[in-house]
């Protein structure tokens, strides 16, 4: 998804923006109140005409969520730990609107436009409630650590990705029709598509036969060198993987709608001036 990347360490020092481990060691204060507040906000005001409400109430969801990691050693989790929570929080996703991202958190969410154009994992109830929060369990009362969480690199991969890995898998499994995947084609250090990314590990493998096509949007950052293009490098690898799964595949670089979004913040960039002449923008 889809997709700055998502890691929940059961040490659970994580955020959906996939910040570095050393930055995510202090648990979110008042975790229960934040969870319940976001849940109620979502229930009453968020995505009302776009995504359905879930049957479980907010306190039942909290109980199920807390049970998954509380009174356990920080790294004593696996990819099944949050299974019951995600079953309770599951939503039907609109056809042809599911979007994944890798390395382009801000751009992807600006483009998705709060669900009006596309749905991201962070627009779903679980993603909305837990986005950017940090938590971890402990064996003693009150069952979770309120002062510090261990660096997630100290946990096994199945533990540190137990929440967001399951979130990504569940989200992808609910997708139908055409799905969209936005990637960064200007990062010299990280390929646009990586098999070990959350998209590569959890989202792409969990797409079902209800999906018809994977549509890739390659974003080239303004003023930066173009590293990856459709049909070459890691994007060719992705195309082969997608077609092997019998899905259709499309790839486009900086479509007009994305370019205009980038240029809104930097209208004087060379690419924006060229686009202005090409598209005859006043």
Curated annotation (Swiss-Prot):
A Pfam family hit: Rib_hydrolayse
EC number from the UniProt entry: 3.2.2.-, 3.2.2.6, 2.4.99.20
Domain of life: Eukaryota
Coiled coil residues, start to end: none
GO terms, molecular function: NAD+ nucleosidase activity, cyclic ADP-ribose generating; phosphorus-oxygen lyase activity; transferase activity
Compartmental location: Cytoplasmic vesicle
Expressing tissues: Ovotestis.
Catalytic reaction(s) noted: NAD(+) = cyclic ADP-beta-D-ribose + nicotinamide + H(+); NAD(+) + H2O = ADP-D-ribose + nicotinamide + H(+); nicotinate + NADP(+) = nicotinate-adenine dinucleotide phosphate + nicotinamide
Major location (coarse): cytoplasm
UniProt keyword terms in alphabetical order: Calcium, Cytoplasmic vesicle, Disulfide bond, Fertilization, Hydrolase, NAD, NADP, Signal, Transferase
Signal peptide bounds: 1-24
InterPro entries found in the cross-reference section: ADP-ribosyl_cyclase (IPR003193)
GO CC terms: cytoplasmic vesicle; plasma membrane
Regulation: Activity is presumably regulated by its sequestration in vesicles before egg fertilization. After fertilization and upon NADase release, it could then be regulated via its potential phosphorylation sites.
Disulfide bonds: 39-58, 75-155, 136-149, 230-251, 263-272
GO biological-process terms attached to the record: positive regulation of B cell proliferation; single fertilization
Protein family according to the UniProt entry: Belongs to the ADP-ribosyl cyclase family.
PANTHER family documented for this protein: ADP-RIBOSYL CYCLASE, ADP-RIBOSYL CYCLASE_CYCLIC ADP-RIBOSE HYDROLASE
Official protein name in the record: ADP-ribosyl cyclase/cyclic ADP-ribose hydrolase
């Amino acid at each position: 998804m889809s997709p700055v990347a998502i890691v929940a360490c059961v040490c659970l020092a994580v955020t959906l923006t996939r910040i570095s481990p050393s930055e995510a060691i202090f648990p979110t204060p008042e975790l229960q109140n934040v969870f319940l507040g976001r849940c109620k906000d979502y229930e009453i005001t968020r995505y009302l005409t776009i995504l359905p409400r879930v049957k479980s109430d907010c306190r039942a969801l909290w109980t199920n969520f807390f049970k998954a990691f509380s009174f356990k050693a920080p790294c004593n989790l696996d990819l099944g730990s949050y299974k019951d929570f995600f079953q309770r929080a599951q939503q039907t996703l609109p056809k042809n609107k599911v979007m994944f991202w890798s390395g382009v958190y801000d751009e992807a969410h600006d483009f998705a436009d709060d669900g009006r154009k596309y749905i991201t994992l962070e627009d779903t109830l679980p993603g909305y409630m837990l986005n950017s929060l940090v938590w971890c369990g402990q064996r003693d009362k009150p069952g979770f650590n309120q002062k510090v969480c261990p660096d997630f690199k100290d946990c096994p991969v199945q533990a540190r990705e137990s929440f967001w890995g399951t979130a990504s898998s569940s989200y992808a499994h609910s997708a139908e029709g055409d799905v969209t995947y936005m990637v960064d084609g200007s990062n010299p250090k990280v390929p646009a598509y990586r098999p070990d990314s959350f998209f590569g590990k959890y989202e792409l493998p969990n797409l079902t036969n209800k999906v018809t096509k994977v549509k890739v949007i390659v974003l080239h950052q303004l003023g930066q060198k173009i590293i990856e293009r459709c049909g070459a490098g890691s994007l060719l690898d992705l195309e082969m993987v997608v077609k092997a799964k019998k899905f259709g595949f499309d790839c486009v670089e900086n479509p007009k709608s994305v370019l205009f979004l980038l240029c809104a913040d930097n209208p004087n960039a060379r690419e924006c001036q060229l686009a202005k002449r090409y598209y005859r923008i006043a």
